[in-house]
Amino acid sequence: MSEITTTDAQAQPEKKDFIRQIIREDLAHGTHTHIHTRFPPEPNGYLHIGHAKAICLDFGVAAEFGGHCTLRMDDTNPSKEDPAFAAAIQEDVSWLGFHWNALRHTSDYFEVLYLAAEKLIADGKAYVCDLNSQQVREYRGTLTEAGRPSPWRERSPDENLELFRQMRAGTFPDGTRTLRAKIDMASGNINLRDPALYRIKHVEHQNTGNTWPIYPMYDFAHALSDAIEGITHSLCTLEFEDHRPLYDWCINHVDLPNNSHLLKPLLDKGFPQEPSQPRQIEFSRLNINYTVMSKRKLTALVDEKLVEGWDDPRMYTLQGLRRRGYTPAAMRLFVERIGISKQNSIIDFSVLENCLRENLDTIAPRRMATIAPMKLVLTNLAEDHEEQLIFPNHPKDDTQGTRTVPFSRELWIERDDFSEAPPKGWKRLIPGGEVRLRGAGIARIDEVVKNAEGHVIALHGWLDPTSRPGMEGAHRKVKGTIHWVSAPHAVAAEIRLYDRLFSIEKPDDNTDGKTYRDFLNPDSKRVVHGYIEPAAAQTAPEHAFQFERLGYFVTDRHDHDATHPVFNRSVTLRDTWQRD
C-alpha cells in the first residue's frame, strides 16, 4: 500500500481549486496558523466511490498544507450502526493510502454536547417540545409558507432544563419529546425553523452502552464536534449548503472557545482541548453514470441478493472496487482528474476505467492466459518437446525482470483467434495461414480438426524452426501475433469477467415507471474456465497482471490460492462498452 505523507503531497504540482485557494488566503491572512480537517463518516454501511472523493480531499488538503486530518465516526444513530462498519471504514481509508492523526467518535463528546445543550436552554436558545414528528412537519410550513411556533416554544428556561434532564434520565418514551433550537419559524431556510437538537431513543450504543436514552441530531453534533476537535475547514458536499447557517448558529451560540468549562469532560478523558471556530465549505458530490450510490439502494442490492455482498466486484463500494482490482493510486488519480468544484456534473464511467488502465499499464506484470481455450498441435515438434523461453515481465520496465515460460508441442490458444471465414482485415489464424506465436516463432495451420457436429475442436500446424526471435527467419512478415499457453504446463483457472452492473447511463431515472432494478446488466458477471501460465498461478491474492491481449486481471482477494487460482477482470485493455 502506498502511503501519502505531507512531504509527498507538498511535492506535487500546486492545485488551484477554490477550496485550496480559500485555505491559502486563510493562512496568508493569519486566520489560521495550521490546517486541521476531518473525515466524518457514519458507521452504518460501507464506503463507496463517492466517499473516495471526500477522503482524498480531506486528507489530501491536510497533507499538502502540513496539517492534520481526523477520522471521526459520526455515531449518533446507534440503531443503524455497527462496529463492523467502523472497522471497514478504517480499512478503506488506510487502503487508499491515508492516515489520520486521531481516531475519534462523536460519542466521545456526548457529555460535552449535553452540557452545550443545557447552555442553550439556559440562554433561552432551546426548548423542549412535545409535538410528535408528524405535528412538527405540519407546524414547519413550506418553502412558500412560514411555519407556526410550537405551543411549547415559550416554556421557561427552568422548565425546559427540568424536562431535558428528565429526558436524559430516561423518563419519557421514544418520540414523545425533542429538544429544539429556538431560531426563526418564519425563516426562508427551513433548516432554521426551530430544528431538533436532541431526540429520545432508548437504544443501546456500540460505545456508550445504555448510558444515553437521548442522542444529538446530526447538525448539532457535527458542528460542535468540528469545533471540539479544532477543525479549521469543514469540507462538505453541496447538499449541506443550506445547513451552513444552522452549522454556524450552533457554533456561535455555544461558543466553545469562550466557554471552556463545557469541555471539562474531555479533560477528564485526557483528550486535547483546542476548540475552534471552523468554517464549512461545500463542494460538488461525485456522480458517475452507470452507477447508483444511494446507501439505501446499495443496501437493497445486497439484501435482495442482486449482488453477492458489499464487496461484490460489481459494487461501487470501496470494498467492491478493491476486490475488482482497482488500486489506491488509480482511485487517487481519478479524484485528481475530475477536480473539485461547486458545479454538479456526471462523470463518465470510462474516466474511472482509464485511470485504472493508466496505473496498471505501468505496474502490472504481463502474463499469458486463455479464457476460451482451443488446442493447437505443432506436428513438426517431437511429442515430448519441451523448453523454457525467457520473457520480460514488463515490456517497458526492465526493473521488473524476466520469467521462464514453458513451451511445448501442444498449446492452448484463444478460440477467437481462428476463423474459417475471416472478416475483412482479419490478421489471425485461418486454414493455411500463418501467425506469429508470441516469443516462439511463426506457425502455419495445416489441418482443422472438427467433431461430429462440425465444430472446430483443435488445429494442427507447423512451426517454422528458423523464425524464433533472434533468428534470420524471425524477420519474415506475418500479419498477426497471438498469445498461447503450453498445454502440459498450463494451470486451470477460474476467471470472472466483470462488467458494468447497470446497462444504461442513468439507472436512477424512474420517469417511465421502472427502477434501477430493471436496468441490471445480465452480462455484468460471466465465469469461464481457462488456462494460465504457471507464473500467474503462484502469487498471492490481490496481485494484478495484464493478461496479454485480454485485459487487466487480479487474483481474487478471498477465493484465490495457488491450488485453485481465481482471477477477476478489473478492466479491459480498451473501452469496448457499447453505448445506446
Curated annotation (Swiss-Prot):
* EC number(s) per entry: 6.1.1.18
Q: Which PROSITE patterns match?
A: AA_TRNA_LIGASE_I (PS00178)
* Gene Ontology molecular function: ATP binding; glutamine-tRNA ligase activity
The cellular location(s) given in this protein's UniProt record come to: Cytoplasm
Cellular component GO terms, alphabetically?
Answer: cytosol
Reactions the enzyme catalyzes: tRNA(Gln) + L-glutamine + ATP = L-glutaminyl-tRNA(Gln) + AMP + diphosphate
Q: Which Pfam families match?
A: tRNA-synt_1c, tRNA-synt_1c_C, tRNA-synt_1c_C2
Q: Which InterPro entries match?
A: Gln-tRNA-synth, Gln/Glu-tRNA_Ligase, Gln_tRNA_ligase_bac, Glu/Gln-tRNA-synth, Glu/Gln-tRNA-synth_Ib_cat-dom, Glu/Gln-tRNA-synth_Ib_codon-bd, Glu_tRNA_lig_a-bdl, Rbsml_bL25/Gln-tRNA_synth_N
Keyword annotations for this protein, in alphabetical order, are: Aminoacyl-tRNA synthetase, ATP-binding, Cytoplasm, Ligase, Nucleotide-binding, Protein biosynthesis
Annotated L-glutamine binding sites: D74, Y218
Q: Name one GO biological process term.
A: glutamyl-tRNA aminoacylation
Q: What is its main location?
A: cytoplasm
The record places the motif ('HIGH' region) at: 41-51
Listed binding positions for ATP are: 42-44, 48-54, 237, 285-286, 293-295
Motif range ('KMSKS' region): 292-296
Entry-linked PANTHER family: GLUTAMATE--TRNA LIGASE, GLUTAMINE-TRNA LIGASE
Family the UniProt entry places it in: Belongs to the class-I aminoacyl-tRNA synthetase family.
- Describe the protein's quaternary organization and the partners it interacts with: Monomer.
- What is the protein name for this chain? Glutamine--tRNA ligase
